[in-house]
Design a protein with these regions (language model features):
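Active-site loops and adjacent core secondary-structure elements that bind or stabilize anionic groups
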Residues: 3-4
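Alpha-helical recognition segments enriched in aromatics with Gly/Pro capping
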Residues: 7, 28-193
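Divalent metal-dependent hydrolysis catalytic cores, especially in the metallo-beta-lactamase
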Residues: 10-23
């Protein structure tokens, strides 16, 4: 929780951040970012949402050196048959009625794709290019590749000069993960007996 993060920062004597950016407070910036990608010819609309058109890039992927033809379309999400390319990714999604989080947008009630949040907020707070972007190794092949693609479509630049990725923490003879139910936070560790 945010309270745990703030408390951990204080207990570890880490300098407090100048800004704490919440994605839900930046919906207008995300909508504007998506519209700019459409205007620049890097995105298009289907009946299910707005997709980034990877065919517009001179190189994709950039960071992972993977062969895109080895990817399995639809491995994580259902394939939208209206997509121009199976590897085009959603940047804005038209919300089904039962979707909890949704906002008014030029495309109806909808919500941001996973990658657009980071691109819009980093552009707002850090500018078109910044020094270091960090994340887990699991973000390289999809999330960070797509952030780069969006930034290239919006500004013509790769957003970060340096990309640094951390490996997974190991716990109980395996990867630690929130979804695996074995994640330990600093708050949990210093409150345990």
């Amino acid at each position: 929780s945010e309270m745990c993060i703030r408390d951990s920062i204080e207990r570890l004597n880490i300098e407090k951040p100048e800004t704490i950016a919440r994605a839900t407070e930046h919906i207008p910036e995300m909508i504007e970012y998506v519209q700019k990608l459409i205007d620049n010819g890097y995105a298009y609309e289907t009946s299910r949402g707005i997709y980034f058109d990877i065919s517009k890039l001179d190189k994709y992927p950039v960071l992972s050196n993977r062969n895109i033809d080895d990817q399995i379309a639809g491995a994580r999400v259902e394939v939208d048959k209206e997509k121009r390319n199976p590897y085009d990714f959603a940047i804005w999604i038209k919300a089904p009625e039962n979707h909890i989080m949704k906002w008014e947008s030029p495309w109806g009630l909808s919500y941001p794709g996973w990658h657009i949040e980071c691109s819009a907020m980093s552009l707002k707070y850090l500018g078109e290019q910044f020094d270091i972007h960090t994340g887990g190794v699991d973000h390289i092949p999809t999330h960070h590749e797509n952030e780069i693609a969006q930034s290239k479509g919006r500004t013509g630049k790769i957003p970060a000069k340096t990309w640094m990725h951390v490996e997974f923490l190991q716990v109980d003879n395996g990867k630690m993960g929130k979804s695996l139910g074995n994640a330990y936070t600093f708050c949990l560790l210093y409150t345990s007996p």
